[in-house]
Amino acid sequence: MISDSMTVEEIRLHLGLALKEKDFVVDKTGVKTIEIIGASFVADEPFIFGALNDEYIQRELEWYKSKSLFVKDIPGETPKIWQQVASSKGEINSNYGWAIWSEDNYAQYDMCLAELGQNPDSRRGIMIYTRPSMQFDYNKDGMSDFMCTNTVQYLIRDKKINAVVNMRSNDVVFGFRNDYAWQKYVLDKLVSDLNAGDPTRQYKAGSIIWNVGSLHVYSRHFYLVDHWWKTGETHIVKKDYKGEWK
């Protein structure tokens, strides 16, 4: 059975209440946030607030597939956030394709695929993204990139492959929607690859469970939370928003 976790809609409610009560947490840069500590929910929608950016999601996926640790290799214009966190050489840690496919990180995808192929009931089907040296690697050569995803565990139950995502930190607006798209891609690929190895398996993608140490919304996106609280709509263009958090 899947734990009786919260849904995305319930996460919206908790964040809406935090904003209404002005329960702010100030981050290291002095920016106000609202935050859920120890968030755990079923990722049953592809975004929480805002709207999907399919064009960027596809560009990021292509970069992940390349396994490049350099932001210049992101197709199209390099997003400002990646430029800001990169080292003086334009290098980062958080190419998630590198994290699961590179031999330099012990081929996490292949290890997980082999484990689940040999033992479908295993609790060892896990892809480890981060590493102990991240404590030092995150600020190498002027970098500011402490990988947000720790591990993703895959559990096969009742012919469904469920993903349990474990993160130290996740931005609700930009972070979640892009990370969800990536995790959905990897889950679907894992299902396909396991079925290709033995057509009698007939596995299907199950639930994605999202566990986050700090799930947060930055003040620049408070207007989205407020708009949802008042209307039930998850997105509005900022210039059209008329509330307190303009």
From Swiss-Prot:
So where's the catalytic machinery, residue-wise? C148
> What InterPro entries does the database record attribute to this sequence?
Deoxycytidylate_hydroxyMease (IPR014619), Thymidate_synth/dCMP_Mease_dom (IPR023451), Thymidate_synth/dCMP_Mease_sf (IPR036926)
- The UniProt record lists the EC number as 2.1.2.8
Q: Which UniProt keywords apply?
A: Transferase
Top EC category: transferase
> Is this entry keyworded Transferase?
yes
Q: Which domain of life is it from?
A: Viruses
Q: Which cysteines are joined by disulfide bonds?
A: none
Family assignment? Answer: Belongs to the thymidylate synthase family.
Question: What's this protein's name?
Answer: Deoxycytidylate 5-hydroxymethyltransferase
Which organism is this entry from?
Answer: Enterobacteria phage T6 (Bacteriophage T6)
Q: Which gene encodes it?
A: 42
